Amino acid sequence: MLDKKYFLTILLFLKYLFLLRLTPDLEINRYISFFEQCSNFKSCINPYSQIDLLDKTYLTFPYSNLMYFVLLPFYFLGNVLNISFVNLSYLFFEVVLIYVLQKLFNVFLSNLYFILVLNPLIIYSIGILGQLDFIPLTFFMISLYYLKDKNKYYSIFFIILSLSSKIIFVILLPIIVLYFLKLDETLDENIRTTLY
């Protein structure tokens, strides 16, 4: 009989093989045309320089520049390997998220598999539809990890990455700022934290 750890690793591997064979709808219908504009260095740095050439019926890439730059290496790698860059980025960020969640909450890997890795809703929303919410979520969880370690500047940095990639995380910002201010021991530290 297979050890539980090996069984879960095989399940994870099979999921990744399955996802890498798919190309999400949003990637096909919206993201590809936006990323294909990146034909030279100048057009890659400013992806909106030729946006007037794209279909005007909807916003082609409804995310920030940060999300674009995060996905750009996955786009190039996906082109070389002939696989979906959205699913490739998901697999990368999922591995990072699993690692961070293990460190943050001292959770066994086997407990994360069925909640995160084998969750059909996550597989559908990312693998089939192509939603990119896992990237800012990973940044936010990394921020919480550094917050737990009382390393507030790294935490602030990853909160900024999270907010820059998806604005919805601004809802949690007041709670985290209050926690930062609670960690500070002097008024001078409070002022520096607030200004940072």
Identify what each model region corresponds to.
Residues 172-196:
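Perimembrane helix-loop-helix junctions
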Residues 2-105, 124:
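TM-lumen/periplasm interface segments of multi-pass membrane proteins
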Residues 98-112, 149-150:
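Transmembrane alpha-helical segments of multipass membrane enzymes and assembly factors
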Residues 88-96, 134-142, 165-172:
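Membrane-embedded alpha-helical segments of multi-pass membrane proteins
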Residues 100, 135-152:
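Specific aromatic-rich, kink-prone transmembrane helix
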Residues 123-124, 143, 153-177:
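Membrane-interface alpha helices of multi-pass inner-membrane proteins
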Residues 91, 110-123:
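Transmembrane and membrane-interface helices of multi-pass
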Residues 127-135:
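Short acidic/glycine- and proline-prone juxtamembrane loop motifs at membrane-interface regions
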